[in-house]
Amino acid sequence: MMALFDSHCHVDEPKFDDDREDVLTRMAEAGVTRYAVIGSDMATSRHSADFAAAHPGCYAAIGIHPHEAKGFVEDDLQRLADWSKEEKVVAIGEIGLDYYYDLSPRETQMTVCEAQMELAWELLLPVAYHIRDAHQDMLDIMKRHKKHLTGGIIHCFSGSWEIAKEYLKLGYFISFAGPVTFKKAPKLQEAAVNVPLDRILIETDSPYLAPEPVRGHRNEPTNVRYVAEKIAALREIPLEAFAQITMQNALNAYSIKE
């Protein structure tokens, strides 16, 4: 069976509480053998780490999302550092900048993002980035920290090929989610065609951003196959080969040893 790695999901969130075991069964039947659950604040980070520890093939990222930056306190960094020592914790994230919702002041978002980037450098862990309507500021921060970047993933990439090239120059992987399957996404699809095959990832961001043909419904990791199918078709390569490539890329991005 073809094996898939959903590089970014939230299957540990409450929206799956009523039928999580059914979701996990569907994932196994669909060949989604590995997946990463991603924290967004201290509570969800702790929960993601615990969830990963209890589920084979599951890994965790821990960190403070830009929406939650306003609640950050200095002690959070030490707690994240302590939790990072756990075997299934493979990244800091999701961190970054979100200027679409602006749920935390932009200066606060920047400060908290940079503090966690520095923590990732100290821990030598990759970073899972959430970036929305903030690519230039994020790139400026990354370039300032260029000597201390640890690599990682631009999750749910939403920019153009020109923007993707800037992240690639800094050594990041580019991850595509459901929006790449949408009909009105030519710039995103152009990026998906051009990102080098050794730097491309797939994800669902479940329960959000369900791809075609299930758009509008609760998303789940099983649907990562639709993302893989779309990009493989755009690139005119066999689906099985693309699944194998993105599996290895995710293992590389998260420094997961077989």
Label for each model-derived stretch:
Residues 1-258:
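Mid-domain alpha/beta scaffold segments of enzyme catalytic cores
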